[in-house]
């Protein structure tokens, strides 16, 4: 089963690494890595996989590589 998960990523955050669920069920991922050379994207994917209790190989960034709003494909 494949799902698309939309998340807001906050790179360079002192609050991270953390996954927060907002009142509207939106996921916000705080990562310490800066948005340089895809490091924040990779950190967000790792953190999302851990939050969903899945291996990292089952989480793939499909949209939003240069945006804070990202879409990940999740294989369950």
Swiss-Prot record:
Pfam families: DUF167. InterPro entries: DUF167 (IPR003746), YggU-like_sf (IPR036591). It comes from the Bacteria. Gene3D superfamilies: YggU-like (3.30.1200.10). Belongs to the UPF0235 family. This is UPF0235 protein MMAR_2910. It comes from Mycobacterium marinum (strain ATCC BAA-535 / M).
């Amino acid at each position: 089963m494949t799902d698309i998960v939309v998340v807001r990523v906050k790179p360079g955050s002192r609050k991270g690494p953390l996954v927060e669920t907002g009142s509207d069920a939106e996921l916000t991922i705080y990562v310490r890595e800066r948005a340089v050379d895809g490091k924040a994207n990779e950190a967000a994917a790792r953190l999302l996989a851990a939050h969903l209790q899945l291996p990292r190989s089952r989480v793939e960034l499909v949209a939003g590589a240069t945006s804070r709003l990202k879409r990940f494909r999740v294989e369950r």
